[in-house]
Amino acid sequence: MAQKMLEDQDMLDQLLSGVHDSDLDFSESEEEEEEEESSSESESDEDSDMEVEPARQEAGPPEQCQQQPQQRAREQQPPPQQQQPQQREQGPPQQQQQQRTPKRGEESGDARPRARAPSGDAGPGPSGQARLPQQQQPQQPQQPPPKPPRQEVTVRAPGDRQQPQSQAAQPIPVIGGGCAPFQLRAPIAAAAATGWGGEQAPAQPLFQHVSPLNRRGDEDRRSGRDRRRREGRERDRESRSKGRNWYRPYPRGSSGARREGGGRDAGQGQGTRNPGPSQGGCEAGPSQAQAAQAARAPRQEQGERRQMLPQGQNLGPRPQQCPPQQCPPQPCPPFPLEALPILRAKFEPSCAVSYTNLVKSIQKIAMPPFLMRRREASPPCHFSKIPQATPGLVIPAAARTGEAKFEKFTDAFVQKVIDRGMSPQDCINKTVSLRKLDAKFDPLKTFTAKTVNFGQWLDVRKDSIINSGMSTQVVFLEELCAWAKLNLQHGCNLEERDLILHTAETVCSQLMYKLKPIMSCLEPNKPYASMAKQMAYLVCGAGRIQDAGMLLREVKVGSPLTMLVAFSLCVPVMITCRNRNPSLFNYCKSFLDMYQPGLLCALFNTMTSKLNTTCTEEECYASVRAAIGSVVNTRGLLFVPGI
């Protein structure tokens, strides 16, 4: 039994001699040590296969065997003040706990096999005891895995957004694995913008949106740029003076003059130099040359400072050192183009002119987006607006002659003119000499201006003018020119209410409309034909009668077609521009001064009697005959001036 106790003592000595000082860490409380020792003893008693139980029973209780190693460990343990720095040097507490647990199992006699045993360990020997190595190598503390770097977040102000330092792209996972091509990049520092003096401004983070339709992320930059342009344009509209040429973004001068003080932001006197004291300017104000010299001096100083800096460093934006009155104006951004609706038609080189005209037309009419066909399959119209079909049923406009009121005049001539005017008689029966019309002008003027059936007469006259050929329109034009000439001779205003003068624009536009498709057949001279076509476009297509009169004043008429067009234009132009353009009024009056009864009928007959020899097709003759008309409708015509 004594020999058994000596063997146990040797075993404990070898165990304590092989343990490294760093493994003996008893910094925990004594209560935890007692609990761990009791648990290890219970496990060793139940699981151990070695015959240690008889030796313990002979030697006494097991606490006596464990008192000696505990006393030695306590002697080697440093005080609590020295234990804390030693624990920090040894490593994290998790590693220490892992190192203490197997050693205490060996102290308690636990000889269970382990997954990874040292090279010197072996299984139980023939005596039933575990063979231990002569000296156990100290275990090196395991290094913990490196933790990912924390993303530092800097909050400058309560309203600032938190921007992580990581600039890597953050792909969006999709179903099935992989990443979608649609990614949202982290804030990317924009390139340093060039300042006013050439210095580099601080970079600003921009959010770029990358998608298959926006691969380079230009949409976000473009939207911000357009917004800044709109704000600048509104600001310029408020501050810009409404002087001469105020609508120009910069003066007509050279770019050098614009750099020295011209431009949209230059204030009053855009594009002009500041007047000196001798020119009536402010004596205290600096000249333009002084302002430019003052602006160049800081730039030179800024360049010298930039040369002194090491490579890769830029200067910040230079603060404004001069008053706003002396500093040159900032360059204004160009005007943004107006947004156009998406056109379904595609640009083709062969139809470039047509495409350009299409764009101009859409810009002119300001077509709203909901009226544009965005797709090829879009319907051509709103089918809900189409009513039910009524084949063969057309409702004509009935004449208002039945609503006319009875009126009686004491003058027999006026009564005779009224009776003939309502009936579709021949032109010869309605012919009245110009001298008799001049003699009976006052009672006839009273009827044309104060008749109670004014609306009914206009209805009948316009119906005959619009629904008839050129022969009927030329007869109404004869009546119009003769009556306008008599009004001017008697000092009447052409703008007053008058039954005959009120239809002047209708006669002019309808005659131009009938002449336009056959002008090439009626006029062999191309310059005269082109002039007549342009006047017809201004009157019929655009309704610009005054512009057509101004064009007439700039050219010289010399053919039956152009003279007929000039006589049809003179009366409507005189009615509209008497107070607006007196010179044009006097020019058109010269046509009425040389008017004679029957002159327009003679021009018309000369023009239609001999057609252009180049037109030999039957379709051309058919168009001319249809425009001239086969019947002269004189319903509503009061008189035909004669000699």
From Swiss-Prot:
Compositional bias ranges of the Basic and acidic residues kind: 103-113, 215-241, 298-307
InterPro entries recorded: ICP27-like
Any single biological process term in GO: regulation of DNA-templated transcription
Native source organism of the sequence: Equine herpesvirus 2 (strain 86/87)
Ranges of compositional bias, category Acidic residues: 24-52
Family indicated by similarity: Belongs to the herpesviridae UL69 family.
Compositionally biased region (Pro residues): 320-329
UniProt region (Disordered), positions on chain: 1-180, 194-329
UniProt KW keywords: Early protein, Phosphoprotein, Transcription, Transcription regulation
Name of the protein in question: Immediate-early phosphoprotein 57
Residue spans of biased composition, Low complexity class: 57-71, 83-100, 162-171, 284-297
Entry annotated with the keyword Phosphoprotein: yes
